[in-house]
Amino acid sequence: MNILVTLDRNYLPPLRVMLGSLLRNDPGETFEIYAIGDGLLPEDWAALEELCAGRGRIHPLEVPADLFADAPVARYWTRAMYYRLLAAELLPRSLDRVLYLDPDILVINPVRALYDTDLEGDLMAAATHTGLLAGITDPVNRLRLENYEAEAYYNSGVLVMDLSAMRREVRPGDIFDYARGHADILLLP
């Protein structure tokens, strides 16, 4: 199963927790973990490889600097935040599907059913906030997002991606232009 994580060095501790929870809660799976990272040292990659030994392989990916030359960045909108949106550009062409997991989540169930979700021609599948979490996030989103509707909002921390479709449809410049044009409402990635 193909897993994508994106990070900089600040997210190494939570990534270790997330990967540990993924491996513990899905004991029957083997994972190909593609990691797009900024500023990681060789010993960082070695520690991640050791953590996943026997159950998964870490594939460190380099980021072409020129791809992000026009990317607007801010405190919460770092270069690393864009990596998931441009996954199809950064991952090997041999991959057609990947499950993106934020480094700061906990995996509490097997992820195979999620990974195998029928996307019905859509580029991605994502979850909305529900239950107790919606009671926390909805008021914040009403303040920061014009015309906020809970049903139209999704959590970008867990995404099933159709990479083949994304390669046909997603253009980096369009993403950067949108981020630049909507910086006032795009507070959190």
Language-model segment annotations:
Residues 31-39, 126-127:
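Short internal beta-strands
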Residues 3-9:
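A conserved hydrophobic helix/loop-capping motif in glycosyltransferases and polysaccharide synthases
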Residues 105-139:
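Conserved donor-nucleotide/metal-binding helix-loop-beta segment in metal-dependent transferases, i.e.
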Residues 43-90:
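Active-site-proximal specificity loops/subdomain of glycosyltransferases
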Residues 101:
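Catalytic metal- and UDP-sugar-binding loop of GT-A-like glycosyltransferases, i.e.
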Residues 129-132, 151-189:
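Catalytic core and acceptor-binding pocket of nucleotide-sugar-dependent glycosyltransferases
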Residues 98:
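Short aromatic/hydrophobic "clamp" motif used to bind/position activated sugar donors
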Residues 21-30:
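Short, acidic, metal-binding catalytic loop of nucleotide-sugar glycosyltransferases
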